[in-house]
């Protein structure tokens, strides 16, 4: 049960606490203080992908948001999430860490010529490390440092070549970034090997479903993370 602020005691077999993602650290402290056993959920780490609407046209028109899951060669699960046809990539401020996200407007007049969606790699931890949210926050913080407090954007072709993207190469690409403040950089310096390898394998697999997504001009914004 629970004891309320006015000292009222409520007895129950099960208690649901709704503290939100920002309240996870507080809840962790409360559980540790009172010896309450906890089970950690997974954390998802990845990127926001952006390409031309025409590449995603069939999926956009038929499904609006396709749901694809891929088992990588390193044993991770990769999934697509939150697709936004004719949408915009945006910045999400999560407890002071800038993360990539995306949205689309209901009014077609406000739309772009690009589709964006998340590619997320799931990670679970046990011992000796059992703080998955902290792990994702550290990766997001590193991305912020390398982009001077912003979001990194990188061409898929530059990722495959192992080089950072530059403003010149981004400008010469066929996909115009909708997040103008994103800073060209190298996500290979931020994302762990298993994450990057999983993302590349997923994009190559998606290319069979929606040809053109594995183009050199496809953009990766990082980092995107989902906390549970």
Residue ranges and their predicted role:
Residues 1-228:
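Residues forming the flavin
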